[in-house]
Curated annotation (Swiss-Prot):
Positions of post-translational N6-carboxylysine modification: K231
Species of provenance: Leptospira interrogans serogroup Icterohaemorrhagiae serovar Lai (strain 56601)
Binding-site residues for ATP, renumbered to this chain: G122, T123, N124, G125, K126, T127, S128
Pfam family, one: Mur_ligase_C
Keywords for this protein: ATP-binding, Cell cycle, Cell division, Cell shape, Cell wall biogenesis/degradation, Cytoplasm, Ligase, Magnesium, Nucleotide-binding, Peptidoglycan synthesis
Name of the protein described by the UniProt record: UDP-N-acetylmuramoyl-L-alanyl-D-glutamate--2,6-diaminopimelate ligase
Broad EC category: ligase
Length: 504
């Protein structure tokens, strides 16, 4: 791709500085990256606003010969004075990260155009729902891919990206590889961070699915309205040249608000709304136990379908119902979906049950790390009627601090005992995090244990379990690491529980 062709395609990008003796017609562009370490000579280094004061450092380290920055005469002029004159500087009026996805897609020939992409957004349930959809489609012979918190899956490949929604350049490369391997349908998680930062700009999305919206990420979003608008962004980037549709849980927190906003903005968009005001898709007759979950899903025309699944918890009633509606939207067979839901593979770190050797005690490992998710998982474990429920949790450091006391109140109210421990403390002092959590307990409430060492806390929690008791280990789920300071260490809640039970 010639530089001149790129500038014609993106008139919002202007040529700021060009080395003397060179012709823009002769400059070849291979790709665009926002990670300076990934750049090659003929790449564009996209200098995101979030880099802040380190722009000069990252530009110096980048191998890229082209640099894209936001228009700022002071910053650009300072850089032009000190940078190697062989660099080509491009400028734009907005955060370059918002253009990165469109440029990446353009340079790769728009790989997402040839894929059916179903994107799921929401505070809780994204990973479960995308994994359920992946299983349903795969069982019906569809070559499908999965992108999300647990990683990227397609064919026999599993890739850990480290992000729920990969950066725009990585995402487009993944989609290109999927297309080349014959993948036709992709189920992906769309995080609020990814949507707000423009990681999905330029991606052709056929369907948007919304699970719920409750408090989280207020360290990143200015308030809940900003968080909501970031989620709504998914429906603004739908590709209406495809058979586009939306799926949402009308009765979920902020579900009705989103429904009416979509309806006002896109009145012709097909919406499958679970438990909406017209009761077209109504859930009833819910049955929950440790053997599985069942319910009746009402369909249009006064029809009903009994849904049974091995997935546990009341939240999986909503997840499987949303998956069923999404499956209808993409043309999956109803009977085959019903059969597949009975035997969905265990989703790592989501209501994952581990029994002691004699099965007299159990632990549940779950990713719940928000107030709403913690309440849902505790209530779901309660449905199994354990003789004693001990909830072990912490809160991530350098993240939304306002949820800490809220999670304490929920744990105290719904559990028999509470253990406070570290999650990913990052650069905060673990004891300070526990202090802030503890402010949410009622006067006089004393947790069973307060231990910053998560492994020790799990061992103590297991040792305190009576026969018929359950330890809920919440917060990290599938994660196989713990971040202490700036160091990422191997750590797995599942492994620690298994060791505490003497299973290996």
């Amino acid at each position: 791709m010639k530089l001149t062709s790129l500038l014609l395609k993106f008139p919002e990008i202007k040529l700021k500085s060009f080395p003397s003796g060179k012709n823009p017609d002769s400059i070849e562009i291979e790709y665009i990256q926002s990670d300076s370490r990934k750049t090659n000579k003929n790449d564009i280094f996209c200098v995101a606003d979030s880099i802040g004061s380190k722009k000069k450092e990252f530009i110096s380290n980048a191998k890229a010969s082209l640099i894209l920055l936001r228009t700022d005469s002071n910053v650009l002029n300072d850089l032009l004075e000190v940078m190697n004159s062989s660099k080509i500087f491009l400028e734009c009026e907005i955060d370059p990260e918002q253009l990165q996805g469109r440029i990446a897609s353009f340079l790769l020939g728009h790989p997402s155009k040839d894929l059916d992409i179903v994107a799921v957004t929401g505070t809780n349930g994204k990973t479960s729902l995308t994994n359920i959809l992946f299983s349903l489609a795969k069982d019906q012979g569809i070559n499908c891919g999965l992108i999300g918190t647990i990683g990227v899956k397609f064919g026999d490949r599993v890739i850990d990206t480290g992000y729920t929604t990969p950066d725009a350049s990585s995402l487009n490369l993944i989609l290109k590889e999927m297309k080349e391997e014959g993948i036709t349908t992709v189920f992906m998680e769309a995080s609020s961070h990814g949507l707000k930062l423009g990681r999905m700009n330029g991606i052709s999305v056929r369907a948007g699915v919304f699970t719920n919206l409750t408090q989280d990420h207020l360290d990143f979003h200015s308030d809940m309205e900003d968080y909501f608008e970031s989620k709504f962004r998914l429906f603004e980037i739908l590709d209406f040249s495809k058979s586009t549709f939306a799926v949402l849980d009308y009765s979920a927190p902020n579900g009705s608000k989103l429904y009416h906003k979509i309806l006002n903005r896109f009145p012709d968009l097909l919406i499958y709304a679970l438990d909406d005001i017209y009761r077209k898709w109504k859930i009833s007759d819910i049955s929950l136990n440790l053997q599985g979950t069942s319910y009746v899903l009402g369909l249009p025309g006064n029809q009903e379908r009994k849904i049974s699944t091995n997935l546990l918890g009341s939240f999986n009633v909503r997840n499987t119902a949303l998956a069923f509606l999404t499956g209808i939207g993409i043309g999956l067979d109803l009977e085959k979906m019903s059969n597949s839901l009975e035997k969905i593979p265990q989703i790592p770190g989501r209501f994952q049950i581990i029994y002691s050797k004699d099965r007299s005690r159990m632990a549940v490992v779950d990713y719940a790390h928000t107030p709403d998710a913690l309440e849902n998982i505790i209530r779901s474990v309660r449905d199994s009627q354990p003789k004693c429920l001990i909830t072990l949790f912490g809160c991530g450091g350098d993240r939304d601090r306002t949820k800490r006391p809220k999670m304490a109140r929920i744990a105290e109210e719904l559990s028999d005992q509470v253990i406070l421990t570290s999650d990913n403390p990052r650069t905060e002092k673990p004891e300070t995090i526990l202090d802030e959590i503890q402010t949410g307990f009622s006067s006089g409430f004393i947790p069973l244990l307060r231990e910053v060492d998560r492994a020790k806390a799990i061992v103590e929690g297991i040792s305190c379990l009576p026969e018929g008791g359950c330890l809920l280990v919440a917060g990290k789920g599938h994660e196989e690491y713990q971040i202490i300071g700036k160091e990422k260490r191997h750590f797995s809640d599942v492994e620690e529980v298994q060791k505490a039970f003497g299973l290996f």
